[in-house]
Amino acid sequence: SKCRHMHGHRYRWEAELEGDVVTKRGVSEEGMLIDFSEVSEILNTHIHDVVDHAFLVYEDDKLALGALSMMETGHRTVILPFIPTAENLAKWAFEQVEPHITSSYGNSLILNAFHVRETPKSWASWFSK
């Protein structure tokens, strides 16, 4: 498998929300489930800012950790308690984001799924139970 070699991805992180659209007339959130800027802020804080321009490595991959330790100061490495496959990252991202998805407008929001795309044609998803 090509994946055994050290490599990176330009991930795309997608949250899939479910809830009731606000129907109250005259309020600024009428017709909305949530303001997308709120979702973006949650994803930036709990996913993007954590992994952006970082090398993701499994905590038990001693060979990779050894190689990464020889890199220059300032190299961003995120050590994970799981192998960083798209499938595992989708589960991890779901767990990071789900507690922060709240009912913004009294509409009982839930995080239905989280999708992680490695490429435009390759992705993995983690769904709520």
What is each of the regions a protein language model found here?
Residues 1-129:
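Charge-rich, low-complexity N-terminal segments
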